Amino acid sequence: MPWPKLEEVQRDAMIEESVEESIKDYGNTVLYSTARNEYMIVRIKQLIRRSVWALTRQMEKGDFEPSGYEMNFGSGKIDRVDTCEDEDVVYVKVTDYKTGMKSFDIVALYHGLQMQLPVYLNAALELEERRASGKTVEPAGIFYYRIKDPIVDREKDDHALEEKILKELRLDGMINAKEEVIEHLEHQLSGTSVLNPIGKNKDGSLNRYSKVLPPEAFAAMLSYTKKKEAQVKRQIYAGEVQANPYELNGSTGCDYCAYRDICGFDPRLDGYSYRSLEKYSKEEVIRRMEEEIENREEPS
């Protein structure tokens, strides 16, 4: 039985069993050696319960079902692939679990950063095409789920409290704006969703907060990702490993770099500066992607 269809007591029992098995792998004496470690185990279980609860709510509202977990491709691993069959079409989306606050940025993708999610979706689409038995396979979306147990203010009733928690755990990413995809993703959507990065206006159109791309633009994003991925591979094979960190929206390639203490790059010294990347609107990024694909140019 798919986990979204399990009763809460069943899910809790499986979480308890899974965590205890993991503890045994590390050695009971280590993780239960101090009161602090024991408390950490309790917090881990709480965090997993909250995540499973939120992920279940997200799945319950739509027609997608998990088709694979921790799926390997090359040296990568996709946390979760979901599919939805609609007559002769199979829609595919991927979800990656994160402990930080990362949000998907299509401008960063254009510059060769944040390629993980679209690379994963391209791989998942190829896999599902081999399974589809002649059916058309189409992309539905790419998502980050942030693993956390948010603290929110109390509400007057349980439903309002649940909505507030779900809003804090809402998925981030990019969605194919095709009408069928939106309907399969979340039934009877009205207003701004607390589950997915989408919302509808009173006239039924998607609101300005929706993180969506028209089907043609979504396809262009995936095609561009393939070209950019090939370019990055060629650069690595050619030995292009110079310290040339970027700067975009106040973030730099050095912020979380494990080698920053030994690479020698220091922007405080003469001759060292970050590679400043251009900022574009979503529409401008898609236009540039489509032009580079059409002109068969090397991605910039």
Regions found by a protein language model. Give the residues of each.
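Structural signature of nuclease core domains in nucleic-acid processing machines
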Residues: 1-300
